[in-house]
Amino acid sequence: MPAVGDDFPTPHNTEKSADSPMPPDEVCRTAKLPPGFELAVFAAEPDVQNPIAITFDERGRLWVAENFTYAGANAGWFDANLRDRVIILEDADGDGRHDKRTVFWDQGRKLTSVEVGFGGVFVLCPPQLLFIPDTNRDDIPDGPPQVLLNGFAEGVVGHNIANGLKWGPDGWLYGRHGIQETSLIGPPAATESQRAKINTGIWRYHPVHRKVEAVMHGMTNSWGFDYDQHGEMFCINTVIGHLWHVVPGARTERMYGIDFNPHAYQLIKQCADHVHWDTGELWHQVQKGISSTTDAAGGGHAHSGLLIYQGDNWPKEYRHKAYTLNMHGRRINCDRIEPYLAGFVAKHEPDFAHFADPWFRGIDLIAGPDGGVYIADWSDTGECHDHDGVHRTSGRIYKLTYGKPTPTQRVDLRAMPLLDLADLLASGNTWLKRAASLELSYRMQEAKSPLPSDLLSFEVANGGEQNLVHVIRMTMNLAAQESRSLPQEFCDELVQMAQNDPAGLTCLYLAAALQQMEVDHRWTLAEQLAARKEFSDDRMFPIMLWLGIESAVTQSPHKAVALAQLSHIPLLTQNLARRLTLEIERDPKTVTKLLDVAIGTECAHPHEIILGMSHALNGWRKAPAPANWSQAAQKFSASDLTEVKQAVQQLSIVFGDGVALDTLSQLATNGGAQPEARRQALRALLASKPTGFAATLHGLLGDRAVAVEVLRGLALYDDPSTPEKILAALGIYPPDARAEAVNTLATRPEYARALL
């Protein structure tokens, strides 16, 4: 199949409205901007239509992914009769408006993103990540696309589809994934165990080592990320919060569903201290219009695109701030990112720009070679899901500048000598810096030059927080590229860092590094980090520390008990107790030792042990009582903390006569309770198979948090209405629940007939 064909289907509009978008020049005239800023039309229909993603190449040309196959929520999401394409827009004379348009490839379907580098073009067309080689750079593909990865969910996925290719400062190609479905991503020949599993969050791919991995799990449907001058990545999101700091191994809050790790007891909240909508409203109310309170807060919860401006065109007071396109509010929100404890906090700044065009649907924004910001406008009337059809024949790229920037001299980084490229790494022009870094990575790969062995020396520019963080990140990246754990000598250096470095960000990355260490090597570093009580209230550090040690707990329970005793991080103490108590039937002696620590005088947070035990056994009907429970109960019943007294009462029941079935049923059906406690309550109830419980289970079929247990329980009850009710809810289930639904429907001939 040719890269560009004469048979490209003519895009047609399904938009129900008879209105038309505001003329592009009028959009620029009516936009409300800060003093001194100008908005200009870089390109507009028919030269660009439905721009879903934009990027620049090493020559400063704008590449645009045009998506025509998207059909909206009421048309099956995608139209198989159409195709998508990648075009190149070039401003040869530097006047701020494109004067050359080239169609590079028009064979795409479900195209969501484009990125250029390493001798070709990367395009994301779920279920595949494709690479289109163009080594001679003649803008004609050298051959058919190569499938680098497959397994991206796309069958039932609409607006939450995988998206967002962007080069990271580490040479990896990053992408995003929405919440509607779970993907198993890997090279075409990879087995299931060799694939990266992701449901919602951030993933990345290494173009040389051909390795893919999940970076961060959580959020809702991220459609934008960028990184600051130090390489710290941030991503944008919708509904539940809008800005997260991306740290490898993090697990964040999510709109719905359950994290893959059942022992991720707490999920990380956003780093912004505010939201852009009135949370007293339901999230979907904005579809009917923006209330005055949501307008004042920022325009709505739906965001697309993220730019941390680091160019040299905008005045200094606008630099190093985060800018995102607010979908419903038709504006650019602005947040100020500041260091806070072990990470960052984002503070609300006045909205940067407002667009009067009712059709304005900003979807991406990036800085260009001259420091101007390019904004991709989908140009349509629908909101996030396009219930009213798609207007495929409109689309714009605007350019936002301070004044009229001096036309940049045309550049071609591929033609530059190596030393000149290296000089650009210190440039104040971030576009040049990033493009030079990518070009250097490509040349290193072409020359097959290994990274110098002393790259990770700890004598880095006289130390300093950002330098140490950079060293940790680089070493983690190298280990990930080679699919190995961190070397022991480096782990020893990490322990020294934890002892001697006062910086919170260093500690945060040390906690992240735990997940890449051999399990047996994690304890010494964890002990040092557990002493950093000044970061116990940080929104990320305690959780990252727990996630780093969690998988080692049951392998070395005696070390876990010792860590609980010396920990000055309350959440860590609680989670250690919680995880150990879950093993009470298999390993009751360890729980007794844990209580000895709580009863003793050397534990900094003994009440957290009781709370952790209570969380662990919430939903249990009965558990064996530790030998020293009466002594512990006597001590903590006298606590001044109400929640500790309540925990003692609950544990005494579980360790005594057991919890009543009615109490378990109330917990199981309480949608506001902890998901794992509800699941455990269902398991305990179903073990006794209470009479008439099928009706209760039917009422829970739409509850994703307990779907597996509910479906498994329905197999115990013969009820003729069960098949119909299961099949009606099947579309909302993740893969494990769908598999359980099939198992249940296969338990009886009449159920199986309904399935068939």
Regions found by a protein language model. Give the residues of each.
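Long, ordered, helix-rich scaffold segments
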Residues: 376, 393, 400-756
